[in-house]
Amino acid sequence: MFYEIMHRESCVAQLSTTGECRVCLEDFMPYDLVLVESDDFDERINNVTNFYYWCASRMLTLDRTYAKEILNSIGASQSVTDRERAQIALSYHCLSLLDVFWVKEENEKIRFEDINLFAHSLSNALVDIALRGHQMTVTNAHLLANDLSTGGLYPKAWVRKEDGFYLYKDGGREAVEREVLASKICRCFDCHQVLYEQGMFENEPVSISKIMTSQRYSLVTYAAYDVYCTNHDWNTLDKILELDAPSYYMMNILDYLVGNTDRHWENWGLLVDNETNQPIRLHDLMDFNRAFQQYDTPEGANCLTVGKRHLSQKDAAVEAVRNIGLNQVRQVEQTVFSEHPAWKATFEERLRVLRNAM
């Protein structure tokens, strides 16, 4: 059997279950999927392994809170391998709200415009499953399961409203407060960023943000881009600085100022133009529910975005302001720290460090 890997309505590659492969549109391949046209047995095995791993990555991760309940609700196994998870993702064509790739079987009569999640409604039942861990029966699981593939450990779900999709993130009152407070601070600086607001779901606090992807723009994680660069013998950070140094440096500045210690390689990356499958800049800065950690000293934690170098968050932020300045557009209102006076003192101290470094 052959699978066709699709980018919107175009077939970019064909792959058999034995690893035979034909790449049709190399420039439109997923960044983190490597397929090689070869008769070599080992390379064909690698093709199959890479394909199933890529498909599995488009489904919820098993270490997600409530993951077992979610899997039960869509009738899936609780203990699954990459291949089994891939089969679950393939059952709904590996659809995603993060990009426009999908998969179909050869000669299957189906179009992206008929099934893509940007244009077709989702059941509100998904929100219950993802956020509260309820046992529910989801009849249209082929459209629902993928909407949990947002990465990370915190319960989250996409909710469709009249003006588009919104991400609701749970994780407890403290995580929500941290994310919303960090967002209020970041808005005082010139940076592409996701705006987080506080809301309620079933009498529990959630942070709410609008989707940044669409049928025109996709998100590619740093992890995926690193796979792509490695296979081209490029230095990933060099390519990112070449593409969008200001956004990279602002990320390091703001993560330092708000004490975000969780900037791992799945929650930052590129915004890609789907017309060309080429990156246009870093995607909007997001994910602050681990802000105000290791926030009792000016140094901060180790910076996770500087490649193999060993820098503290302070050192990375100082390097950043010396390259692009602080780019503060308005003062941070003191009232935002009303419930956290110790955080206010640390923020002001870190802000002074960066101003003095310019």
Name the predicted role of every residue range.
Residues 261:
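Glycine-rich phosphate-binding P-loop
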Residues 1-253, 257-258, 271-358:
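Phosphate/dinucleotide-binding and metal-coordinating scaffold of catalytic cores
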Residues 264, 269-272:
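Conserved protein-kinase catalytic-loop segment immediately C-terminal to the catalytic Asp
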